[in-house]
Structure formats: structure tokens, C-alpha cells
């Protein structure tokens, strides 16, 4: 499954647009990590535990978007976008979406 952030797949012809493919996930922070990350926030530097959490969430959202696109019979997803938001109790939601297409 190919993902692109552009409207077309370079070197390929889109034969059909199948609709929106999407995938999302919600990840919660760990209380123990919050304590160590709070200290890092005071002293400065990357909050690695949070970076890893968001990387995992993005990967999961993209995997779920790919599953959704495959279920529609897609070869690729164009115009891929990722959005994230904080939800209750320190959880983070990441959604991936784009247009599922078939290619010649």
C-alpha cells in the first residue's frame, strides 16, 4: 500500500477514487513516565517517552488507514494527512486519513 501526501502518485495513473480511508488510535500516557518527563520539561530537552508514544500512535493510525483502504480494494492512498489532539486524562488521539484510489 502506497501513501502519498500529494494528489497523485508519481508515475502512476489513478483509475478510480474509492472514498476516504481513515484510521485512528488513542494512546494514554503512563503516570510513572509523566513524573520523569515533568522533570525533563523543567530541565529542558526532548521528552523521549512522549515522542515514542506519538510515533507509535502515528504508526498505528497509518496501519489502520491502510486496512481501511485495503477493505475498499485500494492500491494507494493519496492526500494523506495526520492530525493529533489531546483528550481526557492526558490521552492523545491520532487520526490518519486520505483518499483511497486504484492505480493503473
From Swiss-Prot:
* UniProt organism field: Halobacterium salinarum (strain ATCC 700922 / JCM 11081 / NRC-1) (Halobacterium halobium)
What is a single Pfam family found in this protein's UniProt entry?
A: YbjQ_1
Q: This protein is called what?
A: UPF0145 protein VNG_2432C
Q: Which SUPFAM superfamilies match?
A: YbjQ-like (SSF117782)
Family note: Belongs to the UPF0145 family.
In terms of InterPro entries, this protein maps to: UPF0145_dom_sf, UPF0145_YbjQ-like
Domain of life according to the entry: Archaea
